[in-house]
């Protein structure tokens, strides 16, 4: 078994509300290097930890985390639509392994995924189908949330499973860092919004377009006095990156969900995917060497935008 890790932010506003050209050029260069790394590694399996943004998972049944044996992209925000090349039998085997190790993961045989999963696959592989993949979706936007220690434990068990494989495995985490887009909360929501959050699958093209326009509008004023959203917090982001660089993964056990939401934004909890990915790497091969490939707070994209890579020592 050989394993590598990439963790990176995603943003639905890429190409829709862009920052200055020099910032885009920086990000493009970083992603080009990451793609080259993936190409050279040529993974035989990708395990991706990703969030959902009320496109596949809703409050009618909201699991803290779910593994998919089949997945299809909804194609939101300029991402590719269509099926992912999910390794069904191996995903089932992984689900059984996780359950046998006392982590109560949910299972989906027909999961819809959104840009939170697919944008990173596109950016690193150019496709949704180039490599076999196992998606694991971690609830990161719909409170109440599982504590961070459970996310770390999930990653550890996935890493233990990966260690049994005779494959080149790429582990991906996608989301964060600090950010707060206009994602509604169920508590106190008007009836129509509450109904969407409970069972809003398969919206009309008009409804999806309206949702996209609201996000674009939020991006145009994000970080200014006109925005009601929690601003980006570069200090929090850098401290989180340092934690991963130093392999202090057990420190996340003390993370306060309420404090993170207040200090860095409610959607910052997408960093759970990074926690799971690094925990998987550490459990699969022990110590690791990590690299801060890029970080920049980008208001136009509503993202503390970061990229990290890691491999066993």
Curated annotation (Swiss-Prot):
The keyword Oxidoreductase applies. It catalyses: 3-(2,3-dihydroxyphenyl)propanoate + O2 = (2Z,4E)-2-hydroxy-6-oxonona-2,4-dienedioate + H(+); (2E)-3-(2,3-dihydroxyphenyl)prop-2-enoate + O2 = (2Z,4E,7E)-2-hydroxy-6-oxonona-2,4,7-trienedioate + H(+). The active site is at residues 115, 179. One of its GO terms (biological process) is 3-phenylpropionate catabolic process. Its EC number is 1.13.11.16. It holds the Pfam family LigB. Coiled coil: none annotated. Pathway: Aromatic compound metabolism; 3-phenylpropanoate degradation. Catalyzes the non-heme iron(II)-dependent oxidative cleavage of 2,3-dihydroxyphenylpropionic acid and 2,3-dihydroxicinnamic acid into 2-hydroxy-6-ketononadienedioate and 2-hydroxy-6-ketononatrienedioate, respectively. HAMAP family: MhpB. This is 2,3-dihydroxyphenylpropionate/2,3-dihydroxicinnamic acid 1,2-dioxygenase. It comes from Xanthobacter autotrophicus (strain ATCC BAA-1158 / Py2).
């Amino acid at each position: 078994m050989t394993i590598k890790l990439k963790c990176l932010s995603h943003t639905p506003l890429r190409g829709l509300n862009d920052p200055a050209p020099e910032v885009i050029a920086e990000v493009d260069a970083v992603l080009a290097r990451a793609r080259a790394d993936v190409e050279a590694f040529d993974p035989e399996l990708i395990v991706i930890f990703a969030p959902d943004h009320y496109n596949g998972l809703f409050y009618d049944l909201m699991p803290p985390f779910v593994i998919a044996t089949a997945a299809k992209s909804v194609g939101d925000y300029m991402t590719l639509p269509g099926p992912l090349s999910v390794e069904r039998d191996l995903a089932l085997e992984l689900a059984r392994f996780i359950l046998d190790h006392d982590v109560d993961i949910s299972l989906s045989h027909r999961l819809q995924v959104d840009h939170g999963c697919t944008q990173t696959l596109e950016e690193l592989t150019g496709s949704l189908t180039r490599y076999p993949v196992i998606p694991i979706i971690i609830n990161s936007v719909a409170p109440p949330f599982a504590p961070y220690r459970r996310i770390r434990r999930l990653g550890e068990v996935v890493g233990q499973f990966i260690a049994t494989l005779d494959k080149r495995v790429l582990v991906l985490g996608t989301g964060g860092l600090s950010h707060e887009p206009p994602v509604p909360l169920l508590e106190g929501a008007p009836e129509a919004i509450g109904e969407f959050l409970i069972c809003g699958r398969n919206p009309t093209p008009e409804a999806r377009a309206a949702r996209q326009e609201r996000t674009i509008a939020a991006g145009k004023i994000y970080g200014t006095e006109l925005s009601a959203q929690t601003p980006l917090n570069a200090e929090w982001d850098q401290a989180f990156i340092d934690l991963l660089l130093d392999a202090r993964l057990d420190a996340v056990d003390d993370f306060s969900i309420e404090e993170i939401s207040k200090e860095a934004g409610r959607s910052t909890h997408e960093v759970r995917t990074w926690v799971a990915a690094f925990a998987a790497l550490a459990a699969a091969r022990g110590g690791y060497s990590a690299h801060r490939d890029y970080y920049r707070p980008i208001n136009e994209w509503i993202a503390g935008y970061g990229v990290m890579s890691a491999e066993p020592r």
